[in-house]
């Protein structure tokens, strides 16, 4: 799968010309680099260690976090951070690049931690979403960051630095619309919440619906069943799974 960006840990200071501009990079500095400009750093590879991030990892990170979207005048091609625990970060990158990386969930948490170093930087979300290959994927990732937000087409355009007419055109080419993406994202979020949240009112609110009755209507239309019905099915599945587990334990004894 294509890489979206890399996190670079500099262990020897160096000067470089990146995109026709001179930079001085310090020992211990951390960079997040858009894959589109990664080649500009290749001549200096002996000065740093790095870990690459795939589109799938970025999508999961955006879905699991709740970072406020902050627009910047010009999309950044790389971000800089300092004052991080360099010893720990060095060990993390070494592990993530090693053959010992056989614990998927643990590795994923380490990858998310590396990304989170830059969460407060302006342009962070823009750099990540610009690396997602499809336009509809970029829109979906933005919505997934905060499903309860009253998203408008203009908000998405501001995040992606694109006009409303062009965004509509690109989404049409991918056979979808902003409204459809917003609905799908909220409905999937609702379905996930139903597994752990008993209150339909709270679920509706967390999915951006001011009216619980309209949320129930939209949910039923989308999935063919009401939220309560789906919740009941999940509970039955969970109960059946527990009984099966108890039966297997009894047989083992």
Swiss-Prot record:
Signal peptide region = none
Entry coiled-coil feature ranges: none
Q: Which UniProt keywords apply?
A: Activator, DNA-binding, Transcription, Transcription regulation
Under Gene3D superfamilies, the record lists:
Homeodomain-like (1.10.10.60)
Q: What induces it?
A: Induced by EvgA.
Q: Where is the HTH araC/xylS-type domain?
A: 137-233
What S-S linkages are listed for this chain? none
Q: Name one process (GO BP) from the record.
A: DNA-templated transcription
Q: DNA-binding region located at which positions? A: 154-175, 200-223
Q: Which GO terms describe its molecular function?
A: DNA-binding transcription factor activity; sequence-specific DNA binding
What's the superkingdom here? Bacteria
Q: Which PANTHER family match?
A: ARAC-FAMILY TRANSCRIPTIONAL REGULATOR, HTH-TYPE TRANSCRIPTIONAL REGULATOR APPY-RELATED
| NCBIfam families, sorted | PRK09940.1
Q: Any idea what job this protein has?
A: Induces the expression of gadE and mdtEF. Could also regulate the expression of other genes involved in acid resistance.
**What is the protein's name according to its record?**
HTH-type transcriptional regulator YdeO
Which species does this protein come from? Escherichia coli (strain K12)
């Amino acid at each position: 799968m294509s890489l979206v960006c890399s996190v670079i840990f500099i262990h020897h200071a160096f000067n470089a010309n990146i995109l026709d501009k001179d930079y001085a990079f310090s020992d211990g500095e951390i960079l997040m680099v858009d894959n589109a400009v990664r080649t500009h750093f290749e001549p200096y590879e002996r000065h740093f260690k790095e870990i690459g991030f795939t589109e799938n990892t970025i999508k999961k990170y955006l879905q699991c976090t709740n970072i406020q979207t902050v627009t910047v005048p010009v999309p950044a091609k790389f971000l800089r951070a300092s004052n991080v625990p360099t010893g720990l970060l060095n060990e993390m990158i070494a592990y993530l690049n090693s053959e010992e990386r056989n614990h998927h969930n643990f590795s994923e948490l380490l990858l998310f931690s590396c990304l989170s170093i830059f969460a407060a930087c302006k342009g962070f979300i823009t750099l990540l979403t610009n690396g997602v290959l499809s336009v509809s994927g970029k829109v979906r990732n933005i919505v997934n960051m905060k499903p309860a937000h009253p998203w408008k087409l203009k908000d998405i355009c501001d995040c992606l630095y694109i006009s409303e007419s062009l965004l509509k055109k690109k989404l049409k080419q991918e056979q979808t619309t902003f409204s459809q993406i917003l609905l799908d994202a909220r409905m999937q979020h609702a379905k996930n919440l139903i597994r752990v949240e008993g209150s339909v009112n709270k679920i509706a609110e967390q999915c951006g619906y001011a009216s619980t009755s309209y949320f129930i209507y939209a949910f039923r239309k989308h999935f063919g069943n009401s939220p309560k019905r789906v919740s009941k099915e999940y509970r039955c599945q969970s109960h059946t799974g527990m009984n099966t587990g108890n039966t297997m334990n009894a047989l083992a004894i």
